[in-house]
Amino acid sequence: MRRNRVDVITLGCSKNLVDSEVLMRQFLSNGYTVHHDPASVCGEIVVVNTCGFIGDAQEESVNTILEMVEAKKAGRIGSLYVMGCLSERFREDLKKEIPEVDAYYGKFDWKQLISHLGKSYYAEAENRRKLTTPRHYAYLKISEGCDRSCSYCAIPIITGRHRSRPMEDLVEEVRMLVKHGTREFQLIAQDLTFYGLDLYGANRLAELTARLSDIKGVEWLRLHYAYPAQFPLDLLPVMRERPNVCKYLDMALQHISDPMLRRMRRRITKAETYELIERIRTEVPGIHLRTTLMTGHPGETERDFEELLQFVRDIRFERLGAFTYSHESGTYCDKNYQDDIPESVKQERLGELMAVQERISAAHNEAKIGSRLRVVIDRAEDGFYVGRTEYDSPEVDPEVLIPFVSGQELKPGRFYMAEVTGAEPFDLYARIVD
């Protein structure tokens, strides 16, 4: 165990990662050294920032807590604290089941944790978080919470009502990060497309995106977690006309059959979904759409699932993720539906869906062979420089693999023009041409 060292372990989504980065800056401001590598935890203080979204994430969080409890018993770490979504949702249960943890805190309890340790909380440090990502890119969380009421989702229970961050705060944070070398920003929120309604009485996502794109030094802005119902169409001209706003949109659609959309309480129809996608692709030529779909929601029939498969074949999403339904306590589903789809059926449908998407992804990538694309280099690994295009977000999307060439050294964080020379379903191969 190392004195004056804090280890922060982050589980779950990029929004959780931002929370950890804010907390890490508070520890640094109080004179601690801070580490974010779960493989080398040995601190005087360990904080596990948990995820509580669905069953698999909850299990991973509990297992991580138990691993840290064993490390504490063995003397490899000192105090152990747990916070985040799982702790926000199940704090009393966790206290009973795992009492070895020194204290449990909710998702937004940074001040309480710092106060418990007898340290000072520096409000001015909230916009100076300690990045855990490579310096050239960062996640920018523009709001907290969610006002939607999707049947399956526990996020509003955990995070509360939607709360936009003031636009000036976001602009200032991006300016500060640019000064320190950040060039690429992923805009994230539980619901990106609700931004501004609470603060300004109107949707202001388009204005925010435009203002951020005006900041000198911002190379790429990428939009994540849009909601299809009441989509702000004034965003589309901003995406089309501004070169540093990536032609990329992450919009979770979940399903397409009208019976399922109603049961999911998505507030959009099949016809409206097709119309929205056509409008987006018409107004922003070349845009790459990422979506997330679900299999096995209560009541999903074979006919519903076949509609979903046909939807994927029709739209041919450039990027797609999928997961199986998880029955979560406190949700509308929990109160009104039975979890009536066997797990084996959920998994079978998931596999079939992803097999269809793999063929589509392969075709999209093969069509890029011979094209020239701007690439940012993230790292060097196993004989390749590994980078991404504007159509690829970190961690979740394909990568561009550029073989080492004698006399050619590519720098992480730098942008290059590359010619695509080969393709796999989820990765590209390329060579530098500038």
From Swiss-Prot:
Q: Cellular component GO terms, alphabetically?
A: cytosol
Q: Which residues form the Radical SAM core domain?
A: 132-363
InterPro entries on file: Elp3/MiaA/NifB-like_rSAM, Methylthiotransferase, Methylthiotransferase_CS, Methylthiotransferase_N, Methylthiotransferase_N_sf, NA-bd_OB-fold, Ribosomal_uS12_MeSTrfase_RimO, rSAM
TRAM domain spans which residues?
366-434
- Positions that bind [4Fe-4S] cluster 1: 13, 51, 85
GO molecular function ontology, one term from the record:
protein methylthiotransferase activity
Q: Which top class of enzyme applies to this chain? A: transferase
Q: Which reaction does it catalyse?
A: L-aspartate(89)-[ribosomal protein uS12]-hydrogen + (sulfur carrier)-SH + AH2 + 2 S-adenosyl-L-methionine = 3-methylsulfanyl-L-aspartate(89)-[ribosomal protein uS12]-hydrogen + (sulfur carrier)-H + 5'-deoxyadenosine + L-methionine + A + S-adenosyl-L-homocysteine + 2 H(+)
Q: Which UniProt keywords apply?
A: 4Fe-4S, Cytoplasm, Iron, Iron-sulfur, Metal-binding, S-adenosyl-L-methionine, Transferase
Does Cytoplasm show up as a keyword for this record? yes
Q: Which residues form the MTTase N-terminal domain?
A: 4-122
Family affiliation: Belongs to the methylthiotransferase family. RimO subfamily.
Q: What does this protein do?
A: Catalyzes the methylthiolation of an aspartic acid residue of ribosomal protein uS12.
Protein name (Swiss-Prot/TrEMBL): Ribosomal protein uS12 methylthiotransferase RimO
In its UniProt entry, the species of origin is given as Porphyromonas gingivalis (strain ATCC 33277 / DSM 20709 / CIP 103683 / JCM 12257 / NCTC 11834 / 2561)
